[in-house]
Amino acid sequence: MPEVIKNSENLLFINPEMVENIKEEARKSSSLIARLLMHLSHEDPVQEMLIAMCRGCAVAPNRALGRSESLQVVEGEIMLIMFDENGEVIQRVEMGSPGSDKAFLYRFTSTPWHTMVPLTEMVMVHETLQGPFVQSSETPPEWIPQDPTELKNLLNQAA
């Protein structure tokens, strides 16, 4: 389970020390992921997170039905992978931080099954989702492995 850091400030400034703390939490986490929830409540109409991911983490393909989503790479590089309903890869996009020669921002209006795989030792992304947060009742398709080792194998093959 990713390490979750909750914000309690109405006005939040992100500084280099905070970024390093989030990255350190990711390094210590068994999931190799840590996220700062920038919003105050799951009920907020906009959900924003600063997420640190170490190489080797496994983010299961997911989608947010009926909600828009955007993501900006702040540091490092990822492979964004999109899947069709049957688990076939339909698109791969290498993304990097601004100033790289890669795409650094995406926005989905209708969210497909997707995941990201870190291509560098550490990745920091800023994700924005339409709120409020509602835990999906959608059953993940059979092509998404529940076993962590099988999930990593799927992601390595897809990347």
Language-model-derived ranges and their functions:
Residues 55, 66-86:
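Glycine- and acidic-residue-biased ligand/ion/polar-headgroup-sensing regions
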Residues 70, 84-114:
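Short acidic-glycine-tyrosine-enriched beta hairpin
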Residues 60-62, 80-82, 106-108, 114-119, ...:
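Short beta-strand His + acidic residue motifs that chelate non-heme Fe in jelly-roll/DSBH
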Residues 1-46, 91-98, 150-159:
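A short, N-terminal "cap"/entry segment at the start of jelly-roll beta-barrel domains
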Residues 38-47, 57-70, 101:
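A short beta-loop-beta micro-motif enriched in histidine and acidic residues
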Residues 49-53:
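Amphipathic alpha-helical packing elements
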Residues 5, 90-92, 99-100, 115-159:
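Double-stranded beta-helix
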